[in-house]
A protein has these predicted regions:
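Hydrophobic transmembrane alpha-helices and their membrane-interface boundaries in multi-pass
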Residues: 34-109, 113-123, 140-145
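Alpha-helical transmembrane segments and their immediate juxtamembrane flanks
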Residues: 85-86, 95-98, 146-198
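Membrane-water interface at the C-terminal end of transmembrane alpha helices
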Residues: 125-136, 185-194
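The cytoplasmic-loop to transmembrane-helix boundary for the fourth helix
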Residues: 128-150
Length: 217
């Protein structure tokens, strides 16, 4: 990776961070920027594989997801409203997978794409806190239950009206969706843990220097 690309990544990761932000606020902002980047890369990979397999379905919604992520990110970088950015990004993570599933057909034909919605409550834990994350998880479960309810009761009608996805294509995207979400969650947790360890090391170093100064005085 070149110095220019590394500098760009660093600027994106620290975008919106103010000098007066606490360590926790800095971590929350960095995590959400990291999550946005991971989701963008994963959805781009999703589109590339989608086009290579050539299913007869529109890729408008997945492409629109990328556009919305980018626009929301640009708005945040320009105006710096982290609360709006946080809620709007998590809302995209939560609702968009279900919209895509409903447009395709059902849980099976959409290859379990609703698993992407799990990024919203997981992200809420990391970016907001445990108490705030409960509402996001409840919303995810509600959408999942509602989708399952309608899939169960409208299964026969959907089989007749919705275009069928080749089984091999469905299997590929089942694996891709679960692998992508699992990877994003793992990388986010790993990043959060590393950053917290760095913060603890800085705190320990500051405490050590303070003790040295006290011993000298």
């Amino acid at each position: 990776m070149t110095a220019g690309s590394t500098g760009l990544l660093d600027r994106l990761r620290t975008a919106g961070i103010d000098p007066g932000d606490s360590d926790e606020q800095r971590l929350n902002k960095s995590l959400l920027m990291f999550a946005t980047g991971l989701a963008s890369v994963a959805s781009m990979l999703w589109l590339v594989i989608y086009w290579s397999l050539g299913p007869q379905l529109s890729s408008t919604l997945p492409f629109a997801f990328q556009i919305l992520l980018a626009v929301n990110l640009a708005v945040y970088i320009k105006w710096g409203n982290f609360d709006f950015f946080r809620v709007s990004q998590l809302s995209l993570f939560l609702f968009f997978p279900f919209v895509v599933q409903w447009s395709i057909g059902n849980f099976i034909s959409a290859s379990g794409i609703t698993i992407w919605g799990l990024l919203a409550p997981v992200g809420a834990i990391l970016f907001m806190g445990t108490r705030e994350s409960f509402a996001w998880f409840a919303a995810y479960l509600f959408l999942l239950a509602m989708s399952g309810f309608f899939d169960f009761h409208l299964a026969s009608a959907e089989m007749q009206t919705k275009q069928q996805i080749p089984i091999r294509t469905a299997v590929v995207f089942f694996a891709l969706n679960f692998a992508a979400v699992s990877t994003i969650v793992f990388l986010l947790l790993r990043f959060a843990t590393i950053e917290k360890q760095k913060a603890q090391e800085r705190l320990n170093e500051a405490h050590r220097m303070l003790q040295i100064e006290q011993e000298r005085s």
